Amino acid sequence: MSDGEGEQFFNLEGEDILRLESRLKTPRNDGQIGKNPRRRKEDQAPQEEPKKTTRRPDKNKGLSQLEQLILKYVEEESCQDALKDFGGLIANIRQAHQAEMTSHLEKVATEHRANLQALTKSQQEHEKVSKEILSAVIAIRSNLNENHSPLPKPLDPDQVKAARALGFGIGYRTALNVFDRIKGVTPDNAGSQEVKNLAIRAAEEDEYEGSPTFFRKVIDAVKKRMKQGQ
């Protein structure tokens, strides 16, 4: 293109300039210029601004659930402020919940420690009672073994003497009373020293006063004493 042709290309008429300005300022409609491009700006009707979409599927990728929820109801320009406010609220709720859970766990731990101490004390008492019962059972078993032993249990000498003295008195009076009923002899008449000595020897030999040998020896001695007196 030569210089002359360039000057001729940019040498525009006034009508051409208006048409060009109108094309630059007015949106095109199917490739056509508006009906009245020379209309004044103040006479033109205000055009509605396109509504801003608050949620775009391509922008929601990689967002958290809270961010997606906020984008659903809040304008995109206010999302950052909303996220900050909601984040602070959630942090406060989380701290309050954590403090409540900590207090609850401490209370439960205290109750468990008290229950454990009570259980330990109860176990100690049960162990003490069990030891006492075991000792009693061992003592009873030892006594049963001693009483059922095939070997006779030795007697205390003092107990033997006391039993013999008591047995002799009872046996001697019983023998004399029996003989008195048969022969009509009183204990005073038949109770000489010789008869008493013989009864003592018989009691010492038999070690108890209720044996047939004891009564027989006492009665025989009384008979002999009566014969001597006749």
UniProtKB/Swiss-Prot annotation:
Claim: ATP-binding is one of the keywords in the record: no
Keyword Phosphoprotein: yes
Main subcellular localisation: host cell
Region (Disordered), start-end ranges: 20-62
Domain of life, source organism: Viruses
InterPro entries xrefs: Rhabdo_M1
Biased composition (Basic and acidic residues): 40-61
Annotated keywords: Host cytoplasm, Phosphoprotein, Viral RNA replication
Subcellular location, record wording: Host cytoplasm
Any one Gene Ontology cellular component term annotated for this protein: host cell cytoplasm
Family from the record: Belongs to the novirhabdovirus protein P family.
Protein name, entry field: Phosphoprotein
Source species: Infectious hematopoietic necrosis virus (strain WRAC) (IHNV)
